[in-house]
Every structure is written in structure tokens, then in C-alpha cells.
Design a protein with these regions (language model features):
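Bacterial Sec-dependent N-terminal signal peptides
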Residues: 1-27
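Catalytic-site microenvironment of enzymes
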Residues: 16, 188, 323, 327
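Surface-exposed, glycine-biased beta-strand/turn segments
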Residues: 17-90, 94-100, 107-112, 134-136, ...
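Exoplasmic/lumenal beta-rich domain surfaces
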Residues: 100-135, 216-223, 260-324
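Histidine-centered divalent metal-coordination motifs
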Residues: 105, 159-165
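Short, compositionally biased serine/threonine- and acidic-rich segments at solvent-exposed termini, linkers
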Residues: 164-166, 322-325
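Short loop/turn motifs enriched for small/polar and acidic residues
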Residues: 165-167, 279-280
């Protein structure tokens, strides 16, 4: 039986650094800002939401609607959707470099496009519409005014939801990988650390139930302190953590989490890309029963068999479970 379980955690800042785990090269100066105000974020990429990951950035619009939204790069309007839920009024622009930018919760589209959409709504005699366009219908140049920001659909307040997707696969990428400004010198905060016995032969302090082990933060070193436990068998860990950003009071999802045990990396995952169809696996990443009970999303630092997420940067066989040896 191991008397003391020691684990080392590294929580990266929100900003995706140049040495990010992703193997794909992202253009850093291709896409411009979709707004003409300094960018500040209300929500970041792959934040954990109810039953899904957040697919983009929520950009603040100073608490109001009607800010001009601009095409981030040359391309053409490929699709318009209008709905009373979800993204509300949303525009998709395809670009020649293989990416699609998405602009959601819009108040209205630029006049020529707005006129076309209204005519289609009258023709179909319904509000909710989805219209696809040819490259020659509504071509745009970088910086063209294409819409006004709003609060439509499932939005809880005025903002612009902005995404960058792969045009072919529709997988979403972290927009911060494309060079958007993001001043962040505040480390993420850890609110809880949980130890879980995995399997019938495992126990923590003699009990087959999870145990909260976080005691608090050392003010002198900024390190987090944990209680001493005894454990046997296979142990998993989970962490409740949120990130902060310079200049805002918002809380954000962390960009990367790594688990190290005795100098060896046991598990690591990074939110660079959101694969289409993987949202249902979110609830395998978190302690779902605890979330239902308390609303806190404790993220597992071990991989359960039913977890098919592609976010992991460590090999499949490295599942993050710690085998406690006698001694």
C-alpha cells in the first residue's frame, strides 16, 4: 500500500502558445478581426457547456447590439441560417485557404444579403430558413461589412459568436491558434482535486469512494496543497479548474491539462480542435453525477473506455490511471 500519493499537475494558460501540441500549421496573419473594437472574450474555445463543447469564441460587443461585423478574410458567403434557437441568425463564409468562418447571434445581415433572406422567408412563408449560396452570389473581401452583431437565437446577451472551421470536415479550431490577440498572464485557478478508486480492488483511505484532497493554495509559492491519503489498487484523479484572463472578470475553460506522476507524464489533453460528432463524449470527460448534483465540472485526469474524444496528446495506452504499488 502506498502511504502518500503524489501527483504533479500543469495547467496551461488560456493562450495557445507557438509550441502547442497540434501538428497542424495555422496561418497567423490571414484572418482579420470580425469587429473594429479591441477583442475581449466572454467565452473561449471548447469551454465545457451542458452536453457540448463551446465551438468558438464569444466576443464581447460592449453590452450592445448593432456593431458592424466584418469578413475576416476574402471568400464568399456560403450559407445563411435563421432560427429562433441555437445560433439565431448566422453567416458562414468560405475562404480559399480551406477554412470557413462563422458569425452567429447576428441582429441582421448587410442590406443586400438581408433583402435576399427576407424575400426567401416570404417565399417559403416561414421564419426559420437555411440558404446555401454559390461562390458568385455574395463574394466578399477581407474587411467587408457583412452583418450587425446581435442577440438572436439561444444567446444570453449581446455578443458575437465567432468560429473558424475546416471547410471540408466542419471540424472547429481554436481561433487563438490563428494569431488573434490575447493578453493573458493569469494562471488558472484550481477549486477542487478529487481522487477516485478504479475497480473493486481499489480503495482510498480504506474506502471504495472518491475523496476530495485539495486543501488550498500556498500564498508564498502559489502551489496547491493536498491532504495525505493512503491508497491501494488503481487510482484516478479529477480536477475542477477554470482559467482567468487579464482585464476581465470572466471565467474560462483551460486550454491544456497534463498529469505527471513521479516525473512521468501519464495523461495530457489540449483543446486545439473540436471534431464533429464528439460532443456526446463530453460527459465522459467529467464527473457527470457530481455535475448533476452540484453544477461543478470536475474533469477526469484518466480516460474511461467509453471516452472517444480526440483531444488527448498522450498515447491511447496511457490512460492516466495510477497503479499504486506496495511500499
Amino acid at each position: 500500500m502506498l502511504r502518500f500519493l503524489i501527483a504533479f499537475f500543469s495547467f496551461s494558460l488560456l493562450y495557445a502558445q507557438q509550441q502547442a501540441a497540434s501538428q497542424r500549421e495555422f496561418p497567423k496573419d490571414y484572418f482579420g478581426s470580425p469587429l473594429d473594437i479591441p477583442l475581449s472574450y466572454a467565452g473561449n474555445f471548447c469551454e465545457l457547456r451542458p452536453n457540448h463543447f463551446h465551438g468558438g469564441l464569444d466576443i464581447k460587443t460592449d453590452g450592445k447590439e448593432g456593431l458592424k461585423v466584418y469578413a475576416a478574410a476574402e471568400g464568399f458567403v456560403s450559407c445563411i441560417k435563421v432560427s429562433t434557437y441555437g445560433y439565431g441568425k448566422v453567416m458562414y463564409i468560405d475562404h480559399p485557404n480551406g477554412y470557413t468562418t462563422v458569425y452567429a447571434h447576428l441582429q441582421k445581415f448587410a442590406p443586400e444579403i438581408e433583402k435576399f433572406v427576407k424575400e426567401r422567408q416570404y417565399l417559403l412563408e416561414k421564419y426559420d430558413v437555411e440558404i446555401e449560396f454559390k461562390p458568385t452570389d455574395f463574394p466578399v473581401k477581407k474587411g467587408d461589412w457583412v452583418a450587425l452583431s446581435g442577440n438572436t437565437g439561444g444567446s444570453a446577451g449581446p455578443h458575437l459568436h465567432y468560429e473558424i472551421r475546416d471547410t471540408q470536415t466542419t471540424n472547429a479550431y481554436n481561433p487563438l491558434l490563428f494569431g488573434y490577440p490575447n493578453e493573458d498572464d493569469i494562471a488558472p485557478l484550481v477549486y477542487n482535486l478529487v481522487a477516485y478508486p478504479i475497480g473493486e480492488e481499489s480503495a482510498i483511505d480504506g474506502m471504495q469512494e472518491e475523496r476530495n484532497v485539495l486543501l488550498g493554495k500556498d500564498k508564498n509559492t502559489d502551489e496547491y496543497l493536498t491532504s495525505k491519503i493512503t491508497a491501494q489498487g488503481r487510482i484516478g484523479l479529477g480536477v475542477y479548474t477554470l482559467d482567468k484572463m487579464t482585464g476581465t472578470r470572466n471565467s474560462y475553460g483551460v486550454y491544456k491539462i497534463s498529469l505527471w506522476v513521479n516525473g512521468s507524464e501519464k495523461l495530457s489533453y489540449t483543446f486545439d480542435e473540436l471534431i464533429k460528432g464528439e460532443d456526446p463524449y463530453l460527459n465522459t470527460l467529467i464527473d457527470y453525477p457530481l455535475y448533476v448534483k452540484t453544477g461543478a465540472r470536475v474533469q477526469h485526469l484518466y480516460r474511461e473506455p467509453q471516452n472517444k474524444l480526440s483531444i488527448y496528446t498522450t498515447p491511447q495506452e496511457s490512460d492516466g490511471i495510477i497503479q499504486v504499488e506496495d511500499g
